[in-house]
Regions:
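A short glycine/small-residue-enriched secondary-structure motif
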Residues: 61-74, 90-96
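Non-catalytic, usually N-terminal nucleic-acid engagement modules in DNA/RNA processing proteins
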Residues: 1-56, 60, 66-70
Length: 185
């Protein structure tokens, strides 16, 4: 069976950056390469261990999304993106381009919208699809042929199918994930 891996770029970049926050990786030019190194390590690990048939890396757009246009306060309380992450993103995109790995972006839509759309379509076509992200919100998308591939603290990954998502949150159906997370705040 064909395998598709969809990476949530910013979630993985942030995770990589903060994993090295106490001991950042600085190159000879003074550039903090923690996010680049962590992201590339994740990419290499997936390519060598999972050998996906298809792979795409989704990024959030630079401009507004349909959510910010509908509700101006959407994510307004978030802190500014650290400058080291801002510098890392073009480097990561350049590496992906050099490796001929598709960078997925859609004006007005967040990476999770792009991943959700592609994952559900591919899963319905019989492609085993893995959404690589630490973001719990993706649990609502898990179903037949669509799974979460979550990084574990301390290394490795956890593959979550619908049964595991439901057991993890004590719910009957993955469509309830969003309600549960909404109640949790």
């Amino acid at each position: 069976m064909d395998k598709l891996f969809l990476f949530d770029a910013y979630a993985l970049i942030y995770r990589s950056y903060y994993a090295f926050i106490k001991n950042p990786r600085i190159n000879s030019k003074g550039l903090n390469t923690s996010a680049v190194m962590g992201f590339c390590n994740t990419l290499h690990e997936v390519l060598t261990k999972e050998k996906p048939t298809y792979l795409g890396v989704a990024f959030d757009p630079h401009g507004p999304t349909f959510r910010t246009e509908a509700y101006a306060e959407y994510k307004a309380q978030r802190e500014e993106t650290p400058e080291d992450i801002r510098r890392a993103v073009p480097i990561i995109k350049s590496l992906l381009k050099a490796m001929r790995i598709p960078v997925l972006e859609a004006d007005g839509y967040e990476a999770d919208d792009v991943i959700g759309t592609l994952a559900l379509k591919a899963g319905a076509e019989g492609v085993m699809t893995y959404m690589l992200t630490p973001d719990k919100d993706y649990g609502q998308l898990v179903r037949e042929n669509v799974m979460m591939y979550r990084p574990r603290h301390g290394g490795g990954y956890e593959t979550l199918d619908a049964e595991k998502v439901c057991a993890k949150y004590g719910i009957a159906n993955t469509s309830q994930v969003i309600d549960l997370l909404g109640l949790m705040g």
